[in-house]
């Protein structure tokens, strides 16, 4: 019934698996037949505090009984408190704009870059934004154009001008010219193979751009909100970006996005806006998520989970050398590089048969994005099932 209903009335923009999940608790999901699954995907890095989190559910229910939405024409206390929390926890001297998704956050960042470029005092206006060829920044038209993967650009042109693609980090330095206003990049590419950028290279780029008055904008839609082991991967890299974009895990499943910038006065009233962005419900959820994850971080629980998960992935590479090359990633944004795209697909398919949810990334990487609240029992059960799946490949 569910599959027929979906195919009849919902646009076919997703390659769905028609399992029907009905309930979840932390990193465990149950389907309509009562079968349990270990979730190493978190709804693509969204369910940062797991499924059915009582604290998050309580905060959402409490807020929903009071106010959900009034619009940004009026003061929204949880919005201001969440902005304060993000700024103070990061240690960055920034202000925050709230949106509803990662794509919207990146659109906001691009508008900041373009206004910054337009405001440049010189004969040549700056408008070019450099991104990487294997990047992914969203599916709205401008964010899609910022995405450097040519395969993503079919059918939807003409696109906005002004985007330039670098082959790699070293190539960025060669592309910066007098018309460049910003560089937008991911420190770990979620759709590009989970390969972290070189730390010294990023620091060198930060200095290079600062000397030339070009903005460094970091897309932390997937790496942000403790997924990297720190609040932001930028902190782990020891850099201070001019702009950071956030979404996915910030509200644990409630739609939210955010743009943080050191350009605290870049927007004037009317320059940018969002009807739903920063509403009472999403920002209250964000406050609760940050409170939960901040405690895990401070206690050292998060780092212990990262270390154990990484050790399990490395062990798989040793145990199955015919399938895997190496482990990649940062924090609990991890991957194992398969020896071929065919093996990658087989691993994901066989894992699902054993009721473990994992994802793909790039040409041949199997991606792991478990809830940051993942228990040791769930981790052990998930890897036990995964080993059984791999024996059949």
UniProtKB/Swiss-Prot annotation:
GO biological process entries: L-arginine biosynthetic process
InterPro entries assigned: AcOrn/SuccOrn_fam (IPR004636), Aminotrans_3 (IPR005814), Aminotrans_3_PPA_site (IPR049704), Class-III_PLP-dep_AT (IPR050103), PyrdxlP-dep_Trfase (IPR015424), PyrdxlP-dep_Trfase_major (IPR015421), PyrdxlP-dep_Trfase_small (IPR015422)
Organism for this UniProt entry: Wolinella succinogenes (strain ATCC 29543 / DSM 1740 / CCUG 13145 / JCM 31913 / LMG 7466 / NCTC 11488 / FDC 602W)
Binding site for pyridoxal 5'-phosphate: 102-103, 136, 219-222, 275
Gene name linked to the record: argD
CDD domains (UniProt xref): OAT_like
Cysteines joined through disulfide linkages: none
Catalyzed chemical reaction(s): N(2)-acetyl-L-ornithine + 2-oxoglutarate = N-acetyl-L-glutamate 5-semialdehyde + L-glutamate
UniProt GO molecular function: identical protein binding; N2-acetyl-L-ornithine:2-oxoglutarate 5-aminotransferase activity; pyridoxal phosphate binding
GO cellular component: cytoplasm
Assembly and binders: Homodimer.
Enzyme Commission number: 2.6.1.11
Anything else known: May also have succinyldiaminopimelate aminotransferase activity, thus carrying out the corresponding step in lysine biosynthesis.
Family stated for the protein in its record: Belongs to the class-III pyridoxal-phosphate-dependent aminotransferase family. ArgD subfamily.
Record's protein name: Acetylornithine aminotransferase
């Amino acid at each position: 019934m569910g599959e027929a209903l979906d195919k009849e009335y919902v646009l076919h923009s997703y390659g769905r698996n028609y399992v029907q999940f009905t309930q979840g608790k932390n990193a465990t999901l149950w389907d309509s037949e009562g079968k349990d699954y270990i979730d190493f995907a978190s709804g693509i890095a969204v369910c940062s505090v797991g499924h059915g989190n009582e604290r998050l559910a309580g905060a959402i229910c409490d807020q929903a009984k009071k106010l959900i939405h009034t619009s940004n024409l009026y003061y929204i206390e949880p919005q201001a408190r969440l902005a304060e929390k993000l700024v103070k926890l990061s240690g960055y001297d920034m202000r925050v704009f709230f949106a509803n998704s990662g794509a919207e956050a990146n659109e906001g960042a691009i508008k900041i870059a373009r206004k910054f470029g337009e405001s440049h005092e010189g004969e040549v206006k700056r408008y070019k934004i450099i991104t990487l060829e294997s990047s992914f920044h969203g599916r709205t038209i401008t964010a899609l154009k910022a995405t450097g993967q040519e395969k993503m650009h079919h059918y939807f042109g003409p696109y906005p001008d002004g985007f330039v693609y670098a082959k790699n980090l070293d190539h960025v330095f060669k592309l910066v010219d007098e018309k460049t206003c910003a560089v937008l990049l991911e420190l770990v590419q979620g759709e590009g193979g989970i390969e972290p950028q070189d730390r010294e290279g990023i620091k060198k780029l930060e200095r290079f751009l600062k000397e030339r008055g070009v903005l460094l904008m970091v897309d932390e839609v997937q790496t942000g909100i403790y997924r990297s082991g720190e609040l932001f991967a930028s902190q782990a890299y020891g850099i201070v970006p001019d702009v950071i974009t956030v979404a996915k895990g910030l509200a644990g499943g409630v739609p939210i996005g955010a743009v943080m910038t050191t350009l605290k006065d870049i927007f004037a009233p009317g320059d940018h806006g969002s009807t739903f962005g920063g509403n009472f419900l999403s920002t209250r959820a964000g406050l609760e998520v940050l409170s939960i994850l901040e405690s895990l971080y401070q206690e050292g629980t998060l780092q212990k989970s990262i270390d154990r998960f990484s050790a399990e992935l490395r062990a798989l590479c040793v145990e199955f050398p015919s399938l895997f090359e190496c482990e990649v990633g940062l924090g609990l944004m991890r991957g194992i590089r398969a020896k071929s795209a065919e093996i990658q697909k087989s691993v994901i398919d066989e894992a699902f048969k054993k009721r473990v949810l994992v994802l793909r990334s790039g040409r041949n990487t199997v991606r792991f994005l478990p809830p940051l609240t993942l228990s040791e029992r769930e981790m052990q059960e998930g890897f036990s099932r995964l080993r059984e799946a791999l024996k059949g490949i």
